[in-house]
Amino acid sequence: MQAICAVVKAHKEAPIYGESFPVLVICPAALKVNWQREFKKFAGMNAIILDDRNRQSWQSFYECKKSDGSPLCEVFITNYESLNKFFVRAVDKESKFTMKSIAFDQRVSLFRSVIIDESHKCKSSKTQQGKFVEGICKGKRYVFALTGTPVVNNNTDLIQQLKILGRLEDFGGYSRYVERYCDGPKQASNVKELNWRLWNTCFFRREKSKVLTQLPDKTRQYLTVDITTTKEYKAAEADMVKYLKKYKNASDAQVQKSMNGAVMVQMQLLKQISARGKIKAVCEFVHDVIDGGEKLILFGYLKEVVAELKKEFPKAVTVTGSDNVNQKQYAVDSFQNNPDCKLIILNFKSGGTGLTLTAASRVAFIEFPWTFSDCEQAEDRAHRNGQKNNVNCYYFLGKDTIDKYMYDVIQTKKNIANGVTGTDDQVEENMVNLAMDLFRDKL
């Protein structure tokens, strides 16, 4: 929000229209929709996410004007992995990988500002991401680098980020910086001086522990992501609609009641297909968090999902129905006390209540339960006595699936939570009513 406010304020105070716009947002793939939503919420501005459909024409949204003379769109969003696709024309693979070996798309010059979310992903000048972001940001009026962990390993992590910001010369240039601040076995020297110079040059930090009294003690946000199981999901959704039509047309109340359970099963199937399809996006998010030096609590339901996550993150610990009591306790103790244990994966039945996991202040849900109370209980594994930071909860929702609808019901209306206090039949009837409402236009 602060970056959005800063770029908007710069624009409003600029003597010449457009000094800070258009703006390019570079962020992890899982956060693109969130950035789009935040620009709309806090600045009232539409943002376009770059994809294959607008790969050749995205600039036209800025060049075309509305009746008041302003561009149709001034905010464009992409992820790190897509920089090559949208902004790099060619890379000379025969020569050493430097800025001179990269030919950028001329449309890069259109942007006047760049916001880089999770900028520690650009900390190496030897990677394509680091070089591409550097080239894109060169000569821009405003560049905002956002990260909770600007230094992941040692002081050398700041070099490329300062270079991207156009600030490395303020520290004497590369050689002087390395000599002054990267000496010794830990490549960290004159740390207090570096801290002072950063604060007085280009660095601003709001520590959660110091501003917690001004912030909500627990925040929730949903991240809409593409699923890799779209074809399978659409087929299952079509079957669901067919079944609901039969249910709707059934005249006998007893027949309708007997079909309640089947509708529940099919709704659960849709959730499962969506969950499997979100694994890729969730893995990218998890890598971003733990690579930034933070810990993460991750909740899911399916054994298949947990197995895939465990395969991607072999050092993660788990609290699931497959773990015995000793294994579960070991997982909790390791996560709480071992700084190298960054990820714990839990299902709701085994880990959703009772555990204290205050070593993390981030909780993510690749799947979520039917009830608000279960969601809240899971969130509170981190948000409990002993937690010093604001807790952030992330709900991953599959794009064009039932996820968003279910999330809204759970978080806002709490209809399902109320239903659970009744009998099983009441819960099933509630689910059927929700399904009928969700697919009403298709029945």
What are these regions (language model features)?
Residues 1-18, 132-134, 165:
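Walker A/P-loop NTP-binding motif
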Residues 57-60, 297-299, 307, 313-351, ...:
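Conserved helicase ATPase core of P-loop NTP-dependent helicases/translocases
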Residues 140-172, 177, 211-240, 342, ...:
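SF2 helicase/translocase ATPase core recognition
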